[in-house]
UniProtKB/Swiss-Prot annotation:
EC number: 2.3.1.234
Oligomer status and interactors: Component of the EKC/KEOPS complex composed of at least SPAP27G11.07c/BUD32, cgi121, gon7, pgp2 and SPAC4H3.13/PCC1; the whole complex dimerizes.
Name recorded for this polypeptide: tRNA N6-adenosine threonylcarbamoyltransferase
GO molecular function, a single term: N(6)-L-threonylcarbamoyladenine synthase activity
Localization in the cell: Cytoplasm; Nucleus
Co-factor(s): a divalent metal cation
GO cellular component: cytoplasm; cytosol; EKC/KEOPS complex; nucleus
Family according to the record: Belongs to the KAE1 / TsaD family.
PANTHER family registered for this protein in UniProt: TRNA N6-ADENOSINE THREONYLCARBAMOYLTRANSFERASE
């Protein structure tokens, strides 16, 4: 029968630093013991620099680990493995977290497991929602991919050809001076709810791939022209946020539906930070309803980057014998989803 296994997960691929502790019982069920997070937030109009983000992670990771262990009511002797994000992500923050994982592994003599960030999102989403074999729409600040599992890999059926949808939303939020707290995308969503006019913007879909740079350029040009005080236009920034969301999300729904039709899938799972967006969830639900399919998503505890998803995916890999030697515990900024061998699925 074995014994329950416990993993510590460390995530820091962008401006969110997360620490999670998960327990897998002997029957395979998962229990979240702790899931804590701290976000590096910059002033309105500014993004986050890699060096500053890494400094934030170095300052907060030990306090967060202590908080996680206090919530879980366990100690390092109870941990079976330490899981960390190998990539994809921003180099300096990734390195800061990987360095901490190495240090903890050596001090406490616990094995390391390197985890792909996207696989973490998928496996946590599957665990929380119960989705068995969905088409996955992975949407975040750095990634936009349509994914499905086949023959021991999560295959990418479509993706952005340039910038991610989250990056598009974040950059427009900076252009119009929205706050970065709690996140630019959240504030875009709130402004979009007040929008009343739809402004036509560039729409670029190529098969199951899409492009958001033209959309960003288009909405930026519209903002410069229509929001000019000298322009008599009655268009508001709320209208532009609404139009940006409707256009970008329609592109995402189209490529997701095309992938579902291609592989005859009966469900879709939305993961990643942008997956929290209520309008995206609504549009995906309408499409899925028309197809007689199910749509799954999670709340902000699991959509937004977190440590528990790294612990979940890492522990699944650990149980099939996956280990990462300290000497090989490097990071890979462009770590492709389909580069990972999925040993724990049939």
């Amino acid at each position: 029968m074995g014994k329950p296994l416990i993993a510590l997960g460390l995530e820091g691929s962008a401006n969110k630093l997360g620490v999670g502790i998960i327990l897998h019982d002997t029957n395979g069920s998962a229990k979240i013991l702790a899931n804590v997070r701290h976000t590096y937030i910059t002033p309105p109009g500014q993004g986050f620099l890699p060096s500053d983000t890494a400094k934030h992670h170095r300052a907060w990771i030990i306090p967060l680990i202590k908080q996680a262990f206090a919530e879980a009511k366990i100690s390092f002797k109870d941990i079976d493995c330490i899981c960390f994000t190998k990539g994809p992500g921003i180099g300096a923050p990734l390195n800061s977290v990987a360095l901490c994982a190495r240090m903890l592994s050596l001090i406490h003599k616990k094995p390391l497991v390197a985890v792909n960030h996207c696989i973490g999102h998928i496996e946590m989403g599957r665990e929380i929602t119960g989705a068995q074999n969905p088409v996955v729409l992975y949407v975040s600040g750095g990634n936009t991919q349509v994914i499905a599992y086949s023959e021991k890999k999560y295959r990418i059926f479509g993706e952005t050809l340039d910038i991610a949808i989250g990056n598009c939303l974040d950059r427009f939020a900076r252009i119009i001076g929205l706050s970065n707290a709690p996140s630019p995308g959240y504030n875009i969503m709130q402004e979009a709810k007040k929008g009343k006019r739809f402004i036509e913007l560039p729409y670029t879909v190529k098969g199951m791939d899409c492009s958001f740079s033209g959309l960003l350029s288009g909405v930026e040009a519209a903002a410069t022209e229509l929001l000019d005080p000298k322009n008599p236009s009655s268009v508001t920034k709320q209208d532009l946020c609404y139009s940006l969301q409707e256009t970008g999300f329609a592109m995402l729904v189209e490529i997701t539906e095309r992938a579902m039709a291609h592989i005859r899938a009966d469900s879709v799972l939305i993961v990643g930070g942008v997956g929290c967006n209520e309008r995206l969830q609504q549009m995906m639900a309408e499409m899925s309803s028309d197809r007689g399919a199910d749509v799954f998503s999670t709340d902000e505890r699991f959509c937004i980057d977190n440590g528990i998803m790294i612990a979940q995916a890492g522990l699944l890999a650990y149980k099939t014998g996956d280990r990462c030697a300290v000497a090989e515990s490097t990071i890979t900024q462009r770590y492709r989803t389909d580069d990972v061998y999925i040993s724990w699925r049939d």
